[in-house]
Amino acid sequence: MSKVEAAPRIDQALAPSAEYLAWLRAERREQLTVRGAQLALLLVFLVLWEVLPRAQIINPLFTSYPSALWPTFVELLAATPQQASILTHTWSTVLATVVGFTAAMVLGIAIAAALWWWQGLYRVLDPYLVVANAMPKTAFVPIFYLWLGATFSIYGMSLAISLFVTVLMIYNGFQGTDPNKIKLAQTFGASKSQILTKVVLPGSVPTLIAALKVNVGLSLVGVVVGEFQSANLGLGYLIQYGSQIFKLNIVMTAITILAIVSSLMYLAISWLEAVVMRRR
């Protein structure tokens, strides 16, 4: 008769402690509580948005209803000779946002690296960067329209809103690099370019991720503002068009799509952050 093999014994030293398991359960409960509160808040908002206009507590002409958004979306899906499909409008806005967002990050990193490399240049440009970042960029929409034309003025607006804050954020991240790491690299004979690429840039990954999160919203704002003024395509144009003909269903549908687009972009960057931070 064959002998039944005993189950392998789990090393008690490798088993998670009771305190750790309790902490994990508490973390899961907290996450579920937060998600539940977020969902409840959204539901309360939607219910109030639906009920208050129907009860004539607020004027439905100025708010529309959540229940009207889906029929409006379906209606706008069909392209007409006078109006493009809402999917075309959405794609136009997303494309312009991605272009402006990417340009702001690439130029922001390059300019911040130049300012880190030449500290004298930073001392000269610092007040101008601060003033440029503080200026209301919407005042430049007509100027960009004259300089760049209807299409490229939207990209210019997106870049203008997000570039300066990107430069300042990333430069401050570069300056916050641990000086002991820089001294250690210098001790081993690292050149300035090696210090930048091997020490400063890797050490500034959290700042770069933070700049990505800030930029995705700013770039979208810049695109929508540009579309208000100079476009005949995009969600910003659709909002402007709907408000001019007093069709709040169109306005609210476009705003809802903007909220969904910005949320998806933010989630994509959060996923990228999780991947990068795991590999550090």
Where are these regions (language model features)?
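Transmembrane alpha-helical segments of polytopic membrane transport and secretion proteins
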Residues: 1-41, 267-280
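Periplasmic/extracellular loop-to-transmembrane helix junction in inner-membrane transport proteins
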Residues: 24-27, 55-102
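Alpha-helical membrane-interface segments at transmembrane helix boundaries
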Residues: 33, 87-99, 122, 129-132, ...
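Short hydrophobic, aromatic-rich alpha-helical segments embedded in or entering the lipid bilayer
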Residues: 64-75, 230-243
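Transmembrane-helix boundary motif in ABC transporter permease subunits
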Residues: 99-129
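Transmembrane alpha-helices and adjacent helix-loop boundaries
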Residues: 135-140
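Membrane-cytosol interface at the C-terminal ends of specific transmembrane alpha-helices
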Residues: 150-215
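Hydrophobic alpha-helical transmembrane segments of polytopic membrane proteins
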Residues: 236-273
